[in-house]
Regions:
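Short beta-strand edge/turn micro-motifs at domain boundaries
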Residues: 134-156, 172-213
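Short, cysteine-centered beta-strand-loop-beta hairpins and adjacent loop/turn segments enriched
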Residues: 117-135, 176, 208
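N-terminal Sec-pathway targeting helices
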Residues: 1-17
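Core segments of small alpha/beta cavity-forming domains
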Residues: 30-106, 123-125
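A short hydrophobic beta-strand element
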Residues: 108-118
Length: 213
């Protein structure tokens, strides 16, 4: 019994030290963590969520209402040619996003971290460029009648060009299914009673399909 009396204080003392050490460690770690809000404004969270939904749906006209000081990007314009429609549909249909953590305070307002995933359209475009040149040459060489390739002025027929590009786009999409992941931070500011996202290069990049040129 005497042994237990001596050991118990030691055990409780050790537990106290460990608890204190854990508290200090947690406090130190929290210094480097973003100041997450216990009760974030629902309208700010909705703004970030709705913007990303619009981007994933390819509804850029609707997305504009959640952006602050949007430059003239003509986001409401959709591709009109078959190749553009095919590529853009493939990109938007593959798009998805995840809100990482919650809103946290910044010097200018609030911020929300986001993980965005979509088809690597940049890789598809580069593959399409190579394929188009190969198919273009093959189409000319295999044509039984030059009128299928050239018009009366000796220029390449527009339908021949478009058919070649469309074939190249389809093959490039079939050969390239790689996804690309982007992590970005949406910066939100309160303006005229509404929360708006300040667009930056990372956001513009996913809006433009991640194409680098």
């Amino acid at each position: 019994m005497k042994i237990r009396i001596r050991i118990l204080p030691l055990i409780f003392g050790l537990l106290g030290v460990l608890t204190a050490a854990a508290a200090v460690t947690a406090a130190l770690r929290s210094l480097n963590a973003p100041p997450y809000l216990l009760e974030a404004p629902e309208s700010a969270s909705d703004c970030a969520d709705n913007l990303m939904q619009c981007i994933c749906q390819g509804d850029y006209l609707q997305a504009e209402q959640y952006l602050q000081g949007t430059p003239d990007l003509e986001l409401n314009r959709s591709p009109e040619d078959p190749v553009g429609v095919l590529l853009w549909d493939a990109y938007t249909s593959s798009s998805s996003y995840t809100l990482i953590g919650g809103l946290y305070a910044t010097e200018t307002g609030l911020a929300q971290d986001v993980r965005f995933e979509a088809l690597d359209l940049d890789a598809v475009m580069k593959s399409m460029d190579t394929l188009a040149k190969e198919l273009f040459t093959a189409g000319i060489e295999s044509a039984e009648d030059t009128s299928a390739v050239y018009d009366k002025e000796g220029n390449y027929r527009e339908d021949f060009i478009q058919d070649t590009l469309l074939s190249a786009a389809r093959q490039a999409l079939a050969d390239n299914s790689q996804m690309t992941e982007t992590e970005l931070t949406l910066q939100l500011t309160h303006q005229d009673g509404h929360w708006l996202v300040t667009a930056d290069q990372a956001l513009f990049r996913i809006i433009c399909g991640g194409i680098t040129g």
